[in-house]
From Swiss-Prot:
Belongs to the long (4 C-C) scorpion toxin superfamily. Sodium channel inhibitor family. Alpha subfamily. Expressed by the venom gland. Has the structural arrangement of an alpha-helix connected to antiparallel beta-sheets by disulfide bonds (CS-alpha/beta). Disulfide bonds join 29-79, 33-51, 37-61, 41-63. Keywords: Disulfide bond, Ion channel impairing toxin, Neurotoxin, Secreted, Signal, Toxin, Voltage-gated sodium channel impairing toxin. The lineage of its organism: Eukaryota, Metazoa, Ecdysozoa, Arthropoda, Chelicerata. This is Alpha-toxin Ac1. Residues 19-80 form the LCN-type CS-alpha/beta domain. Its main location: secreted.
């Protein structure tokens, strides 16, 4: 019974997941690494941010624990400027 109640609570309350990735603009272009990368990630709900090399994009801002509503780099989509 406890498992069923716990499952029901999770479904009712909802659980927002988090993920790591290169934060992007709506057009799937990365934010290039700037001194404020950590602040950018935190402002968008992440726990931290750092500079990392991304092939094809250069030095980009990598965020940890971003919420699902913040876009991250989709490798199957191109950056459209």
């Amino acid at each position: 019974y406890i498992v069923m109640i716990s499952l029901a609570l999770v479904v009712m309350i909802g659980v927002e997941s988090v993920r790591d990735g290169y934060i992007v603009y709506p057009n799937n272009c990365v934010y290039h690494c700037i001194p404020a990368c950590d602040g950018l990630c935190k402002k968008n709900g992440g726990t931290s941010g750092s500079c990392s090399f991304l092939i094809g994009s250069g030095i980009a801002c990598w965020c940890k624990d971003l919420p699902d509503n913040v876009p991250i780099k989709d490798p199957s989509q191109k950056c459209t400027r």
